[in-house]
Design a protein with these regions (language model features):
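Mature, structured domains of secreted/extracytosolic soluble proteins
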Residues: 5-7, 15, 19-170
Length: 170
């Protein structure tokens, strides 16, 4: 009987841990990643924390610290200044698509579009998803591309796909 109760306790503990892990929202998942400290700082500076903690669902193409490092010197520091909040907000919301598009859904959209899928960001901009050399490529309005390096980081209010470059609106 003690073994059954102990086994039941372990089972409930495992379920609780999985349930708590799934309760992390987009911001919490990004904040837990050492590769996304710049993104999290930018989200805070833009005042988007509460929005991205909202119900959603959202699909976020999340640039890494290295992606931000590819921008011209001083760009990140300039964007984080309070007087540039509008520009920063525009760039960050350009990385967010309404709805939860996991890798399977993105792949299906690319296939249905004959090799390309147009995604509309919450900022109203357009991104183009395609596949190149077996990797999903996201192209911004200026023709710059980012590749998805990790897909389907699930959150309670959406999904994150890690990308290797910052996307820029027109």
């Amino acid at each position: 009987m003690k073994k059954i109760i102990a086994g039941l306790f372990v089972f409930v503990a495992v379920l609780s841990t999985k349930a708590n892990a799934q309760q992390k929202d987009i911001v919490d998942v990004a904040a837990g990643s050492p590769a996304h400290t710049t993104l999290v700082a930018a989200v805070k500076a833009a005042g988007l924390v509460e929005t991205l903690k909202g119900k959603g669902p959202f699909t976020v193409f999340a640039p890494t610290n290295d992606a931000f490092g590819k921008l011209p010197a001083g760009t990140v520091e300039t964007l984080l200044k309070p007087e540039n909040k509008g520009m920063l907000t525009g760039i960050l919301t350009y990385h967010v698509v309404a709805g939860k598009l996991d890798a399977k859904a993105v792949g299906a959209a690319i296939k249905a579009g004959g090799g390309k899928a147009e995604l509309t960001t919450v900022a109203g901009g357009k991104l183009t998803a395609s596949v190149e050399n077996g990797k999903v490529k996201i192209t911004d309005a200026k023709g710059n591309s980012a590749y998805v390096t990790a897909a389907d980081l699930n959150a309670s209010n959406g999904v994150i796909h890690v990308i290797d470059s910052v996307l820029l609106p027109k």
